[in-house]
């Protein structure tokens, strides 16, 4: 692992960049505001063969008891970043049109705002433009900010004026750049540069920006970030080989010292403001980061089904696992998939809970760290072109790449189904679960039995769902079959008010000593409800 030298200096560039003068897309020899240009009609940019994969396979939005989808009026917009205003209005970026759009949950009406700079650029280039816009946030001055990786730009859309302005994201000539997630923090706009290996903090005032770029400690990816109650920024810095660190950056102290150093014309050194912690086993691509209840740091790993907590006091990581994806998500028409994974992508804190999008499970998970209960809501639309679905009718994923939390509602985008949707977590659940123990200690080769009790909330379940099987759910953080789980039955009916199931939990004779999490519960087509128990092998 190559580590940056300790003598790195923060490049605090007080550039006073005017938003109105920002360059949207650099096109040599032509102005992006040239009104004499012939408008280039690019369409959606996909061939007939490509269109089902990227634009959607379902003409209508779908719904469940907990999830409602809404079809975007313009075809093939490929929605990605999403946020909400305090009044509940939903905003999202369209990666295949260059526009942003809003959705009014009360009227269920979409409004899409044409980006004239994008249209002009397509006309000049005579080609379709497309960009992954990963980050979006609302600022209290009535604007929507979002990132644009294709043009290395940050956009600001004025809600009152309905106008787009942009600035160029600071880049180095010899390093690629990918502005990704974006957070408004007071008068600052914070953006991580995923491939450029830095955080950039823009200070916004009176239509101008100054910025400071904070280099990462390692030459590698700089992913998502979160701010704790003491104004520390936590973010991950990692390499594709799975090595990396969790970084704690003293944001408050840096801001204070930055003002002093600017006046004294001196530099600031990275090592004076950071602490870092080596990744635990199993963490390979930690994209999403959040500060949860009790100020613990939560991280999701996109190469697996794992998510982790980090206690800043004890400096210890704890590994958790989502449910195993259902076969509807991955298909397995070829028969080659032996260990399907859910790929949790981003994670956010909301009240007592944490919310994560499970990309390849086509679910949104809501985890309560206090009770260690995980509720996973199934997204009803599926696109078979992203999974092993040949010959399978209902199969695939909608590529839910982003979500935004507004009270009890979780809004999300479906990148390949041209939908936005909402999970209503206020709706009562169809059943509850209880496990007779929360902790188990096993010797190697030992087996014990725990009792899983499922209580049906029959008033919340339709007659059809009562007849459909409910399945026992289980997964574990252990590897190499160190722990095996065997329920006495695999499915049951919610017709019974209470169903009691014995579950064998066994430690292999060759298991390594250690502490693991085991997830037990039940699931239907629409929802999974589970709880963790802690298993220690001695």
Language-model features: locations:
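Conserved beta-strand positions in repeat-built beta-propeller and related beta-rich domains
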Residues: 92-96, 129, 146-150, 191-196, ...
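Beta-rich, blade/repeat-based domains predominating
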Residues: 75-86, 119-140, 172-186, 217-230, ...
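Long beta-sheet-rich domains in secretory-pathway and surface-associated proteins
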Residues: 427-538
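Beta-strand-rich domains and repeat architectures in extracellular enzymes and scaffolds
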Residues: 48, 71-99
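Blade/loop signatures of beta-propeller domains
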Residues: 33-66, 259-267
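Blade-level signature of beta-propeller repeat domains, shared across WD40, Kelch, NHL, RCC1
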Residues: 391-430
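Secretory targeting signatures
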Residues: 1-39, 520, 538
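Short loop/turn segments that connect beta-strands within beta-propeller blades
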Residues: 104-108, 158-162, 203-207, 250-254, ...
């Amino acid at each position: 692992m190559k580590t940056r030298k300790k003598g790195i200096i923060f490049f605090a560039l007080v550039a006073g960049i005017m938003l109105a003068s920002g360059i949207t897309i650099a096109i040599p020899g032509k102005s992006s505001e040239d009104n004499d240009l012939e408008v280039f009609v690019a369409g959606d940019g996909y061939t007939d063969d490509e269109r089902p994969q990227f634009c959607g396979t379902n003409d209508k939005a779908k719904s469940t008891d907990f999830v409602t989808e809404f079809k975007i009026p313009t075809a093939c917009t490929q929605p990605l970043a999403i946020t909400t205003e305090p009044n509940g209005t939903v905003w999202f970026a369209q990666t295949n049109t260059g526009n942003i759009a809003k959705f009014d949950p009360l009227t269920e009406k979409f409004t899409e705002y044409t980006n004239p700079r994008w249209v002009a650029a397509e006309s000049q280039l005579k080609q379709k433009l497309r960009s992954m816009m990963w980050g979006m946030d609302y600022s209290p001055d009535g604007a929507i900010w979002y990132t644009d990786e294709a043009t290395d730009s940050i956009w600001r859309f004025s809600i009152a004026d309905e106008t787009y302005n942009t600035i160029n994201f600071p880049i180095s000539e010899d390093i690629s750049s990918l502005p990704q997630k974006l957070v408004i923090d007071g008068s600052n706009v914070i953006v991580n540069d995923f491939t450029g290996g830095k955080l950039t903090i823009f200070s916004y005032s009176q239509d101008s920006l100054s910025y400071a770029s904070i280099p990462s400690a390692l030459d590698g990816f700089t992913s998502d970030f979160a701010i704790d109650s003491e104004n520390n920024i936590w973010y991950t810095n990692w390499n594709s080989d799975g090595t990396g660190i969790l970084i704690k950056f003293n944001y408050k102290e840096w801001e204070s010292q930055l003002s002093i150093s600017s006046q004294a014309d001196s530099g600031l050194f990275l090592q004076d403001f950071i602490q870092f912690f080596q990744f635990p086993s199993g963490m390979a691509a930690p994209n999403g980061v959040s500060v949860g209840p009790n100020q613990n740091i939560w991280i999701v790993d996109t190469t697996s089904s794992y998510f982790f907590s980090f206690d800043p006091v004890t400096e210890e990581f704890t590994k958790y696992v989502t449910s195993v994806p259902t076969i509807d998500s991955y298909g397995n028409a070829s028969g080659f998939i032996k260990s399907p994974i859910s790929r949790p992508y981003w994670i956010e804190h909301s009240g007592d809970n944490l919310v994560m999008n499970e990309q390849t499970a086509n679910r949104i998970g809501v985890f309560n760290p206090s009770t260690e209960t995980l509720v996973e809501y199934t997204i009803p639309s599926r696109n078979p072109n992203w999974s092993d679905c040949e010959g399978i009718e209902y199969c695939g994923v909608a590529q839910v790449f982003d979500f935004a939390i507004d009270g009890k509602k979780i809004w999300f985008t479906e990148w390949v189904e041209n939908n936005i949707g909402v999970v209503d977590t206020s709706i009562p659940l169809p059943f509850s679960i209880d496990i007779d123990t929360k902790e188990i200690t096993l010797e190697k080769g030992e087996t014990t039995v725990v009792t899983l009790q499922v209580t049906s909330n029959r008033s919340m379940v339709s007659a059809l769902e009562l007849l459909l099987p409910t399945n026992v759910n289980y997964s574990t953080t252990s590897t190499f079959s160190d722990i095996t789980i065997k329920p006495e039955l695999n499915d049951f009916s919610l017709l019974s008010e209470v169903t009691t199931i014995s579950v064998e939990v066994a430690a292999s004779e060759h298991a390594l000593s250690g502490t693991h999490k085991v997830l037990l519960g039940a699931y239907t087509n629409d929802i999974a409800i589970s709880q963790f128990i802690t298993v220690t092998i001695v």
